Amino acid sequence: MKYTFCPHCGSKAVLKEIGDEGLMPFCEQCSIPLWDTFTTCIICAVVNEKQEVALLRQGYVSATKYVCVAGVMKLGESAEETAVREVAEELGLTVKKMTYIQSYPYEKKEMLMLGFQADVQKADFQLSGEVDAAEWVPFAEALEKLREGSIAWQLVKTVIGAS
């Protein structure tokens, strides 16, 4: 989010030269720079011991392609706690091991997505109301079910070691 008004006092921001940052919004009333902000989210490639990845269908995200488990961090929650919670909420699975992979800026929605590999024991899914369907997909078939170049596609490609 780029600030036009101060979120603390409501004053209109002015552009001010701030060191190496250059021109940026500044609140003269509060005497503070107004740094751009983003929503921090997680995205998980959920994998099992059979070399399969859990892919989800969520109509509100894509009518034609699959996605990965993803969600917004809650205040006071670590990224790892968010990832474990989202896997449990969306798929009803318990994470055995969590590995951080990398971060992915998603400028279109002003988000920073933190990518994880979540290792689970293969089991039937207990889907949340926001998931239309999910399936275990062999590593060799996973990328073709995701939108090429999407953050989910990039994460799964890294996790399964595809080139």
Identify the role of each PLM range.
Residues 1-2, 14, 63-66, 107, ...:
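Nudix hydrolase/Nudix homology domain
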Residues 1-61, 72-124, 163:
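N-terminal leader/linker segments that precede catalytic domains of diphosphate-processing enzymes
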